[in-house]
A protein has these predicted regions:
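Preference for solvent-exposed, low-hydrophobicity sequence contexts
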Residues: 1-267, 272
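Extracellular/virion structural assembly segments
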Residues: 2-3, 8-17, 26, 200-211, ...
Length: 408
């Protein structure tokens, strides 16, 4: 018997985009033929859990086509850790899987004699193996996850799991939390290079805390608050704060045995004075990781309430203070509206991803992530004699939980 499985996909795939396997068999012309796929999954080992058996028919071209994506997507979930300290293993946004293949068909050439008898070929002992990420690629950007043990690869440039382009420096203020994620790590070091306002390098720090060679996905703590500690400065061979007051920018790369293993991401520290208290928002990006942005203009908070009431008629001898209507309970929802400062083109493109995301969080000063629901977003466009590209943007959120109140 000839039984062949041909992957029409890569070893690592986006779970929210269908990816396919083509199956063929010399038995495919037999009566009531069905191909069989047994799916197994786990955080690291794909044999941890059995997801189920799935049967699919032969197509007119003689092949069977099967995608495990819809099955596997129910096992991945987001994992936000804003206050991550260096390497923090984060496995739930990815899943290892394996598929064992087989087939079934009626042994009889006709529906007589052995009607209902089914022949199962042996499930193959050399299963398909791969990983999926809690990610999706848009139609206009059909990038692939790397088929090697590295990071995402676009134009052969290893990148980290963020929608912010490494080609553009990103602004960040002091005392802000931020993480960036990596997948299939070969690097065991986060390299931080710091620079003063004149672009002179003043520090180089190699961070390895939390790294484990058996972990394939990490959240990396790279915000100014995450890096608010002292470490050995490779330039001076002394223990110093990573981001002292004279640091204007810092460059983050992944490194292994002295060799850089990722593109470099530059963060420019914004120490400007502001009129309003800032609001830090995070969201689930297309890589199944999280991106962060600071809204610098006015923040408005409001409350919506819904009453559940009971009404009674007052007796003729009622007393002052007796109620005719009683509020049995109140459902309270808090809303928050935040507005950006004037945006660059890179920031505007970045926030388009925020507007498209289905999960958002408010990051407080302690690194807690409070879940939000994005209601809508409105661009506020300003006009100028020189340009019409001066604009900011307002995002309207609801907290994704009701406030606890007393009940009568």
């Amino acid at each position: 018997m000839a039984f062949t499985v041909t992957p029409l996909c890569r070893n690592d795939e986006h779970v929210f985009n269908p990816f396919f396997f083509q199956v063929s068999s010399s038995n495919s012309t037999k009566l009531n033929h069905r191909f069989i796929a047994d799916i197994y999954h786990g955080l690291v080992s794909p044999t941890d859990s059995y997801a189920g058996r799935f049967k699919f028919p032969v197509r007119p071209d003689g092949y069977g086509i099967f995608s495990p994506a819809r099955v596997l997507e129910s096992f991945v979930q987001s994992n936000i850790t804003p206050s991550a300290d260096q390497f923090v293993g984060s496995l739930t946004p990815q899943r290892a899987y394996s598929i064992k293949w087989g087939e079934e068909y009626d042994n009889s050439a006709t529906l007589t004699g052995s009607t209902g008898v089914t022949i199962y070929s042996a499930i193959t002992t050399n299963p398909t193996f791969g990983y999926v990420l809690n990610s999706a690629h848009p139609y206009e950007n059909n990038f692939a996850l790397s088929a090697t043990v590295e990071y995402n690869v676009i134009s052969a440039t290893p990148i980290l799991l963020t929608d912010w382009s490494y080609l553009t420096p990103k602004k960040i203020r002091r005392a802000e939390w931020e993480t960036i994620a990596c997948f299939r790590v070969l690097s065991n070091t986060i390299k931080i290079q710091t620079f003063d306002s004149g672009s002179t390098q003043v520090g180089e720090f190699l961070l390895q805390n939390g790294y484990n060679s058996g972990t394939i996905r990490y959240n990396l703590g790279i915000g100014t608050n995450n890096l608010d500690f002292s470490h050995n400065n490779e330039l001076t061979s002394s223990t110093e704060p990573i981001l002292p007051a004279n640091v204007h920018s810092y460059l983050i790369t992944m490194e292994f045995n002295g060799a850089e293993r990722s593109a470099g991401y530059t963060y420019e520290i914004d120490d400007s004075c502001l009129l309003y208290e800032t609001t830090r928002i995070a969201w689930l990006n297309q890589f199944g990781s999280h991106d962060f942005f600071t809204f610098k203009l006015i923040k408005r908070e409001s409350i919506n309430r819904k009453n559940t009431e009971w009404e009674q008629y007052l007796p003729y001898n009622y007393s002052i203070g007796d109620r005719g209507r009683t509020n049995l309970g109140v459902e309270v929802k808090k809303k928050i509206s935040v507005t950006t400062d004037w945006l660059t083109d890179a920031e505007a493109t970045f926030l388009d991803k925020c507007a498209q995301s289905q999960e958002h969080w408010l990051i407080d000063s302690n690194g807690n992530a409070l879940p939000l629901i994005l209601v809508d977003t409105t661009p506020d466009v300003g006009q100028s004699i020189l340009t019409d590209r001066i604009f900011n943007r307002t995002f309207n959120f609801e907290y994704a939980f009701s406030q606890n109140t007393q009940r009568t």
